[in-house]
Amino acid sequence: MNTDASRLRWRCRRGMRELDQLLGWYLDTRYAGSDDAAKAAFSTLLDQQDPELWDWLMGRTPCEFLPWRRIVDEIRTRDHI
């Protein structure tokens, strides 16, 4: 694993195991094949607070920022959440 991926892996570790799993899934299965804009969006998405991420991923509140919403939607459709 390269240094950037290792840093992202660490940043995917959250205060909730469920978030760890969802964000880790994206990193493991989608990140490498993403374009540079999506990679940058994922990195900034990881700067958000856990409660906000959780609400977006559970569909409780909409994610208004389009680049993040694309990632959130992809994660949500992974398990038909």
Regions found by a protein language model. Give the residues of each.
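Positively charged, polar, low-complexity stretches
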Residues: 1-81
